[in-house]
UniProtKB/Swiss-Prot annotation:
Xref: CDD domains: GluRS_core
NCBIfam families for this protein: gltX_bact
EC assignment: 6.1.1.17
Span(s) of short sequence motif 'KMSKS' region: 252-256
Name the UniProt record assigns to this protein: Glutamate--tRNA ligase 1
Length: 485
């Protein structure tokens, strides 16, 4: 490790959005490719919405994806504590320092006064900003407000007519004027809790963070933070703002585009290495443009300079294709183990012994290479777990085609007389019955397939019939025969 330090600082207020996970991933890849220290910090100052359950979920999702951190709440380091709720005294100390140096002040404005100021600014056609009403209060005025029961916030003084410039590692030079920042900003709320822009500067400075890598939705926070860095005499880190991920309609990725939380993909049976691979390619690509890469290969090839500024599109079809490649390369045992919870939730299985497990391996192996995500198995392999299959209008037409009844009755009779149904037995049987009935090809196979599966396509009959078992096959053949007019 060298002196480079990066951090991922989520709030434990809900499930982790895909965009936040991509931010964590870029910080992780930077740390591992550059030999930097990767810090996990929990920003839990929103006491009402923060919870330990969501904090545990953050750990779980990062670990599932294979993102390891070097310092954090569970991995003490030299710059802890790593939860903001445990650092309140530190923030108060620096807020007081700013007040003493006349760089911040207590503000007693009521919400009604602030709303009235905002309304008047809008009426004038101005950008709403704090008026600075409390910047120069006398001691007597402050005491009067306190007697009224007003609880102050602490505001940081935003200088007038200052130009803040910084070199973004992804977007290049960014220039923002101080008069667009909304006026003197609140850094400590009336309940004593620090605001995001204040706490994040204190934490990043004291934790020696050298590179702040985050989403571009933070760009307008950066000049405010730079002003606080300067006011406190802290060294300013390098900033990188990754482009936001868009949905297929090129608007910001949201719930209307489908699943937007990493946990939803984990629960559906997407593989962590596929998600790691896919997310790494949202705004970054290796020089050789290879798409399927292991975690180790991505780390080896990762170069921060190859992150581009254009907004990437979250292409679910691309993710499904990529996940399918990883499923195909996985062992059947791994996919069965991932499928079992889905099959249980569907009510298809209960207890599992070695015989059932081996049967599941045989069933799932029929579909494994075609799965885009593991949860699809409950629908694709449904016919193996239900007693009866349903027939659509289209499949009923197939059952009513010429010779169907003859074929189904002959197959039923022979299977009823069989002692054991194996793949070899079924293969020989179907070959023999085509000769006996003089019905061949699709005209022979399709009625059988539809009768026992309810579908007009799928895995080979010679594999399906032994796995379904004699009783199910006979019952379905009987039902189909009775449907034929």
């Amino acid at each position: 490790m060298n002196n480079l330090r990066v951090r991922f600082a989520p709030s434990p207020t809900g499930a982790i959005h895909i965009g936040n996970i991509r931010t964590a991933l870029f910080n992780y890849l930077f740390s591992r490719s550059e030999g930097a220290t990767f810090v996990l910090r929990i920003e839990d100052t929103d006491l009402e919405r923060s919870s330990k359950e969501f904090e545990e979920l953050i750990f779980k999702e990062l670990e599932w994806l294979g993102i390891e951190w070097d310092e954090g709440p569970d991995k003490p380091g030299p710059y802890g504590p790593y939860r903001q709720s445990e650092r309140l005294e530190i923030y108060h100390k620096f807020a007081q320092k700013l007040i003493e140096e006349k760089k911040a002040y207590r503000c007693y404005c009521t919400p009604e006064e602030l709303e009235e100021d905002r309304r008047k600014a809008v009426e004038r056609g101005d950008i709403p900003r704090y008026s600075g009403r409390c910047r120069y209060l006398t001691k007597e005025q402050e005491e009067a407000f306190i007697r009224e029961g007003r609880k102050p916030v602490i505001r940081f003084i935003i200088p007038d007519d200052e130009v803040i410039e910084f070199e973004d590692m992804i977007k290049g030079k960014i220039t923002i004027k101080s008069d667009t920042l909304g006026g003197d900003m609140v850094i400590v709320k009336s309940d004593g809790m620090p605001t995001y822009n204040f706490a994040v500067v204190i934490d990043d400075a004291l934790m020696k963070i050298t590179h702040v890598i985050r989403g571009e939705d933070h760009i307008y926070n950066t000049p405010k933070q730079i002003l606080i860095y300067k006011a406190l005499g802290f060294e300013i880190p390098k900033f990188a703002h990754a482009p936001l991920i868009l949905g297929p309609d090129r608007t910001k990725l949201s719930k209307r585009h489908g699943n937007t939380y990493i946990g939803q993909y984990r629960e559906l049976g997407y593989l962590p290495e596929a998600m790691f691979n896919f997310l790494s390619l949202l705004s970054w690509s290796p020089e050789d443009n290879v798409e399927i890469m292991s975690k180790e290969e991505i780390i080896k090839k990762f170069n921060f300079r190859r992150i581009h500024s254009a907004n990437p599109v979250f292409d679910i079809e691309k993710l499904n294709w990529m996940n399918q490649q990883y499923i195909q390369k996985s062992s059947i045992e791994r996919i069965v183990d991932l499928a079992i919870p889905h099959l249980r939730r569907a009510g298809y299985i209960d207890g599992i012994d070695d015989m059932v497990y081996n049967w599941l391996k045989d069933v799932i192996s029929l579909y494994k290479d075609g799965l885009q995500y593991v949860a699809q198995i409950t629908e694709k392999a449904k016919m193996f777990f239900v007693e009866e299959v349903e027939y659509s209008d289209e499949t009923v037409k197939i059952l009513n085609s010429p010779n169907s009844k003859i074929v189904l009755e002959v197959v039923k009779k022979v299977i009823e007389e069989a002692d054991e149904i194996t793949e070899e037995y079924v293969k020989d049987l179907l070959k023999k019955l085509q000769k006996e009935t003089k019905v061949k090809g699709k005209e022979f196979f399709m009625p059988i397939r539809v009768a026992i599966t309810g579908e007009d396509h799928g895995p080979e009959l010679v594999k399906i019939i032994p796995l379904l078992g004699k009783d199910k096959v006979i019952n379905r053949l009987k039902k189909a025969i009775n449907l034929i007019k």
